[in-house]
């Protein structure tokens, strides 16, 4: 059997299993095992039956709807390649729309950026890499309450200035020392309505804690909007991702705080409503009761 024939059979198996991107996935899995990229697969000569056995096993796992990214162990996101796997939400291409918006904004020379619900560190690490590519600096804080997600985030943030904080964004008066200090806040929080029907890759493999946002999908979004109102300085910028059914609800929520101007609904790369942006205005909120971080909110700087 040739590699081309093996890929053809794999693509047919994946299509029969309901995988939308069957051919693409079959090629990516082959490239992963070959240690090359898809474009160079025609140049690859499989060393023997052992390769085809491994390929059969990994394709069978994909046919069981194990996410492609779990099998490969990485996912591309903007300018970075992130480590992902069981226990952490796999970043989606849709979220790159927030990244594109954020990188187009005018920020101070060394801004303070917060990524709330950072998960694998996707937005935080991508923003850090973007600024590094331009020779620019920033202080970037990623926040999440999942130990497993933060393990991946630490690995992804290695060699960057990203700081990671273990904390629940729904905690009242979280991190009061950030009040009125943040220049840019982005968030891809859990936002899927609880009753939504999901693809097997999502329902069976992504952590539910990172997916579902309450009956209407707005529970964590509401908490994040509250934090943005506190943490952003006047003129600070905010972007939050939402379900494609809750764009109007998110716009109404942000607008109802009376703390933001230029509230805009925005679409993802596929043209679906996906995130809302706004600018903070008005007086700074009162400082928190104390400036200390709760010891449960452990902070760590990624190893260089």
From Swiss-Prot:
* Enzyme Commission number, as recorded: 2.1.1.297
Q: Write down the Pfam families for this protein, in alphabetical order.
A: Methyltransf_25, PrmC_N
- What reaction does this enzyme carry out catalytically? L-glutaminyl-[peptide chain release factor] + S-adenosyl-L-methionine = N(5)-methyl-L-glutaminyl-[peptide chain release factor] + S-adenosyl-L-homocysteine + H(+)
Keyword field: Methyltransferase, S-adenosyl-L-methionine, Transferase
The entry marks the following residues as binding S-adenosyl-L-methionine, namely: 144, 188
Q: Name one GO biological process term.
A: methylation
The residues that the entry says bind substrate are: 188-191
For molecular function, the Gene Ontology terms on record are: nucleic acid binding; protein-(glutamine-N5) methyltransferase activity; protein-glutamine N-methyltransferase activity
Q: What class of enzyme is it?
A: transferase
Other notes: Was identified as a high-confidence drug target.
Q: What is the recorded function of this protein according to its Swiss-Prot or TrEMBL entry?
A: Methylates the class 1 translation termination release factors RF1/PrfA and RF2/PrfB on the glutamine residue of the universally conserved GGQ motif.
- Assigned protein family: Belongs to the protein N5-glutamine methyltransferase family. PrmC subfamily.
Cite the PANTHER family for this sequence.
HEMK METHYLTRANSFERASE, MTRF1L RELEASE FACTOR GLUTAMINE METHYLTRANSFERASE
Q: Return the protein name.
A: Release factor glutamine methyltransferase
Biological source species: Mycobacterium tuberculosis (strain ATCC 25618 / H37Rv)
